[in-house]
Amino acid sequence: MVHLTPEEKTAVNALWGKVNVDAVGGEALGRLLVVYPWTQRFFESFGDLSSPDAVMGNPKVKAHGKKVLGAFSDGLAHLDNLKGTFSQLSELHCDKLHVDPENFRLLGNVLVCVLARNFGKEFTPQVQAAYQKVVAGVANALAHKYH
């Protein structure tokens, strides 16, 4: 559960309505893989991840980033039940994929940076603070099955 004020909810949803999920998803996942290269081990089947340009141009990275942001969108629609919303994904990432739950926090922070880059002055400190709460809540929900 994420505790947002009514103003924060409005700001989060207003900005999210302008997000190009395809582009932002691919950019966020790509930047995660570039900045934190050890996360690439979970994506060995994606082909060439040998350089930042290869990662950022990789169609499988872009497609999976879109999928990730689709799940994030679902979370935004269910902020009062994030653990329930992400229960199956948490189980998959914990039991089958064995993803370090810290990676969820890293991806959330990268997403905030990508949103700031894409929205500039529209991504005010207040909007950033609200998004930090959301990505922390999503990361916590995804890590739930690890506890």
From Swiss-Prot:
Tissue: Red blood cells.
Positions annotated to bind heme b: H64, H93
UniProt subunit comment: Heterotetramer of two delta chains and two alpha chains.
Residues modified to Phosphoserine: S51
GO biological process: hydrogen peroxide catabolic process
Phenotype when changing E7G: Or in position 7, in a common allele
GO molecular function, one term: peroxidase activity
Every Globin domain range: 3-147
One GO term describing the cellular component: hemoglobin complex
Pfam families: Globin
InterPro entries recorded: Globin, Globin-like_sf, Globin/Proto, Hemoglobin_b, Hemoglobin_oxygen_transport
Record's keyword terms, sorted: Heme, Iron, Metal-binding, Oxygen transport, Phosphoprotein, Transport
Keyword 4Fe-4S: no
Name of the protein described by the UniProt record: Hemoglobin subunit delta
Family designation: Belongs to the globin family.
Lineage of the species this protein comes from: Eukaryota, Metazoa, Chordata, Craniata, Vertebrata
PROSITE patterns given in the database record: GLOBIN
